[in-house]
Structure formats: structure tokens, C-alpha cells
């Protein structure tokens, strides 16, 4: 059995998305600063059902004019494990709140991890 423990939740406001980190994980933010790029992993909790996890082919971007593709070849939220990934810039950190660019996650979306972006590790050489 696998166990995921959210480290915080997403909060949307007019200008930014705010990552609200739970108090027990705030110490893990040490070393992050304004201007850093981070990778944020979230759990698409509103798309999480047994039926939706079985969907393995989708029309990209939900457009039926696009031919069906396997979910691993798309950015669809319908997946066997509904994990979302965003690479974003930190605009501000205040206590347990990280202010980032807007992302398409709902309020209260569980944050499952944050990683510092590393060009060496995260950008393949083509």
C-alpha cells in the first residue's frame, strides 16, 4: 500500500495562486526564495474516481476534433493517478504561503510535493 500525505492546499485569488503549506511542513521551505522556480505536484481530487482512473484515452484538450490519444501522451487530468505538475516562479513567500503564477487548480486542491526546479535535471538536452 502507498500513502500520500498532502503538505498543503492551493488557494486561488485574483492575482496569484497561493500555496498554503501546513505548519508541520513549513521548515521544508527553508532555502526557497523569491524568484526561484519550483515544481509543484498536486492531486486532482475533483477528478479522482474509480471510473475516471480507468480512462486511458482522451481527446487532447477535451476537443473532440483532436484524435484520441493515450493519457500518458497528454496533459489530461484523467489519469490512473490524477497528479498535476506545474513549473512556476515564486513571487513571494510569507510564513507558510508561497505566491506563484496562476495555475489551473481548484481551491483546496491538495499539494503533494514541491521541488526546486533544476535546469540540469529538469530540461532534457535535445
UniProtKB/Swiss-Prot annotation:
What residues bind S-adenosyl-L-methionine, as annotated? Answer: 45-46, 75, 106-109
Keyword annotations for this protein, in alphabetical order, are: S-adenosyl-L-methionine
Matching InterPro entries, A to Z?
Answer: TrmO-like_N (IPR023370), UPF0066_cons_site (IPR023368), YaeB-like (IPR040372), YaeB-like_sf (IPR036413), YaeB_N_sf (IPR036414)
Matching entries from SUPFAM superfamilies are given as:
YaeB-like (SSF118196)
Give the TsaA-like domain ranges. 4-126
What is stated as this protein's family in its record? Belongs to the tRNA methyltransferase O family.
Could you identify this protein by its name? Probable S-adenosyl-L-methionine-binding protein MJ1583
Amino acid at each position: 500500500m502507498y500513502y500520500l500525505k498532502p503538505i498543503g492546499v492551493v488557494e486561488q485569488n485574483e492575482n496569484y495562486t497561493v500555496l498554503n503549506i501546513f505548519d508541520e511542513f513549513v521548515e521544508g521551505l527553508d532555502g526557497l526564495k523569491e524568484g526561484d522556480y519550483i515544481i509543484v505536484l498536486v492531486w486532482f481530487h475533483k477528478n479522482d474516481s474509480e471510473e475516471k482512473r480507468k480512462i486511458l484515452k482522451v481527446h487532447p484538450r477535451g476537443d473532440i476534433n483532436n484524435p484520441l490519444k493515450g493519457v500518458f501522451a497528454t496533459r489530461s487530468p484523467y489519469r490512473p493517478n490524477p497528479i498535476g505538475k506545474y513549473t512556476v516562479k515564486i513571487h513571494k513567500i510569507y510564513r507558510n504561503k508561497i505566491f506563484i503564477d496562476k495555475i489551473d487548480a481548484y481551491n483546496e486542491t491538495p499539494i503533494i510535493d514541491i521541488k526546486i526546479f533544476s535546469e540540469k535535471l529538469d530540461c532534457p538536452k535535445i
